[in-house]
Structures are given as C-alpha cells and as structure tokens.
Design a protein with these regions (language model features):
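A short glycine-rich beta-strand->turn/loop micro-motif centered on a GG-aromatic cluster
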Residues: 1-3
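Helical "lid/coupling" subdomains associated with nucleotide-phosphate turnover
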Residues: 5-12, 16, 20, 46-62, ...
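Short glycine-aspartate micro-motif
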Residues: 21-25
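Short beta-strand scaffold segments in enzyme catalytic cores
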Residues: 31-35
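Short hydrophobic beta-strand segments in globular cytosolic domains
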Residues: 41-42
Length: 210
C-alpha cells in the first residue's frame, strides 16, 4: 500500500497526467519503490534494507548497543557525534549504503518492459534522512547499467507537494511524513471510487490519473 500511497501523494488531482517518476519510501525495515510512467503505476518493488539495517551495521562494527548505534547514526547528520567515532560510523554506513544501492539497481532492472526508466527520483520516509543515501544516488554511476536516458535527479518529497491535504498544525515539516499523508489521501480517495467490478490496481490507476 505504501508505494501506491506515496504515488498518490505526489500526483494529486491536478498534476500532469503524463508524470513519470521513481518514488522510493525508505522505512525502518524496507525500501519500497514505485515506478510511474505516463501517469500510470507500472509496478512496485520492495527489498529488506531500511533505516534499521544501518543502525545494525554501526552496532556490529563498533561493538555498541543498538540504542548507542542509533544515536551515532543520527548524530552523524546533526554533527553530534564523538570525533573518535565518526570514521567508524561513516565506514559502517557506507558499506550498508553500497548494498542498498545494489538493491535499488536490482529492483529497477526488473522493470524490463519499459523502454526507459523515468529520470526523476523522489525519496521519502525516515530512513531516507541519511545523507549517505543521497550521496550514493547522486555520486555513483549505478544508473549506467539501467535504461535511463540521462542521469537521474534525486529529491526528497516535501509535505507541500502533497495535493489535497493541508497541515494546519505546522508540525508536518519534512519528507518523513509523506507516507502517512499519502495513506490518508488514498483513504479519502477510496470513498469516491467505489466501482464494484474494479480491481485494486484499476482503482489506483484511476486515482492517479484523475
């Protein structure tokens, strides 16, 4: 459900129906991908590397508790990490990120019925907050083995890009809320699309192209 929800969150009602993009939701335990081509969902893929895999890598390599490893991982982005631990944490995260980028490459290679893959990539989810993920996607040449027509551009999805949902609390501030907002949007949409003979896929495609 999550990749479809993220797709719905990005496209909205008034978005260009010819939208093509790769959407990635990096959660705690998995990474979910959805490929949108000309406004339709071409499929979704999932593999088991999320934010906790990076924490476990730090835990294992540095010989610390899971809680301490999580603090080190988060501290790397906020510059609140002991200087003596920085290199070890960076090395642990880098090794896991290299495996993760291999998972992205493998997942996208399975969309072999498309002539080419969309060059726009949008990330969301708490796991995507790690700077090293963006660095791997933007700095490596992993995409050259796949049918991209140009180097992909990578961005986080912003809450203000979610059509039809307005945050009046001021608390929804970044990409970590996008999946929940997308699920809310799909829940609202399903009340409007109630064709008894339609499959879930048909309903989702109708929502995406509305």
């Amino acid at each position: 459900a999550e990749p479809f929800a993220v797709a719905r969150a990005v496209i909205g009602n008034n978005f260009n129906q010819n939208l093509s993009a790769i959407l990635m939701d990096v959660g705690g335990g998995t990474t979910d991908l959805a490929v949108i081509n000309d406004g339709g969902v071409q499929g979704t893929k999932m593999f088991g590397i999320g934010g906790r895999a990076y924490t476990h890598a730090v835990e294992r390599d540095l010989g610390v508790s899971f809680e301490q490893a999580e603090e080190f991982k988060v501290g790397l982005s906020t510059n609140k990490i002991p200087a003596a631990k920085r290199t070890g944490v960076e090395d642990a995260l880098k090794k896991t990120a290299e495996v993760w980028i291999g998972g992205i490459e493998l997942a996208l290679s399975e969309f072999n019925k498309l002539d080419h893959l969309p060059h726009r990539m949008f990330l969301c989810g708490g796991g995507s907050s790690l700077d090293i993920l963006m660095e791997q996607l933007e700095g490596k040449e992993w995409y050259k083995t796949l049918p991209f027509t140009r180097k992909p551009t990578v961005h986080h999805i912003r809450p203000d890009q979610v059509a039809g949902i307005t945050d009046t609390t001021g608390r929804i501030t970044d990409h970590t809320y996008i999946t929940a907002m997308g699920l809310l949007r799909v829940g609202m949409d399903t009340q409007q699309f109630s064709g008894a003979n339609e499959s879930i896929r048909d309903k989702i495609d109708k929502m995406l192209s509305t």
